[in-house]
Regions:
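Short, surface-exposed, charged amphipathic helix/loop patches that serve as local interaction elements
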Residues: 25-32, 36-145
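Long, acidic, intrinsically disordered low-complexity segments
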Residues: 9-32
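Low-complexity intrinsically disordered segments
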Residues: 1-15, 136-145
Length: 145
């Protein structure tokens, strides 16, 4: 059991837990990248970063008001993309410059994701990240494990 715990804890760096995502439109491969599973803390960090908080005067504390879903999804995709692919795609300064020259406002890797992935493509990538991260595993599979 101890060895199993140790191996299970390494899911974020385990290459067997990764999946290649290909962005194909009209039969043409535009680009591809590899994603990995995320831990709860990574999901939470992305959510907090893109949630607007307001101070509740009655309770004297900040409460979440609204989460920017578009930025949140892009942050999840960015976080789940392996480092090598993040550097080649989302953080590539040449890509930023070219997109800026086309009139798109690129300030960071999240902006590249927003402009380069269609809404439905982002949803599908998020689904794959969730599956890799252990969401939507059937009860039967959990019982087997």
């Amino acid at each position: 059991f101890i060895q199993g715990l140790i191996e299970a804890a390494g899911f974020a760096t385990n290459e067997d837990e990764r999946k290649r995502i290909e962005i194909v439109r009209n039969g043409r491969l535009f680009f591809a990248f590899t994603i990995r599973p995320l831990c709860s803390e990574e999901y939470d960090t992305c959510k907090k970063k893109h949630t607007k908080y307001v101070r509740n005067k009655q309770l004297g504390m900040k409460l979440p008001e609204d989460t920017n879903r578009v930025k949140y999804q892009s942050a999840i995709i960015y976080q789940a993309t392996i480092k090598e692919d993040r550097e080649k795609l989302w953080d590539n300064k040449k890509v930023w410059a070219t997109l800026n020259d086309q009139g798109l406002q690129i300030m960071n890797g999240l902006d590249v994701i927003e402009y380069c992935l269609k809404a439905g493509e982002k949803d599908k990538v998020i689904e794959e990240i969730d599956l890799l991260s252990g969401f939507e595993i059937g009860l039967e599979e959990v019982a087997k494990n």
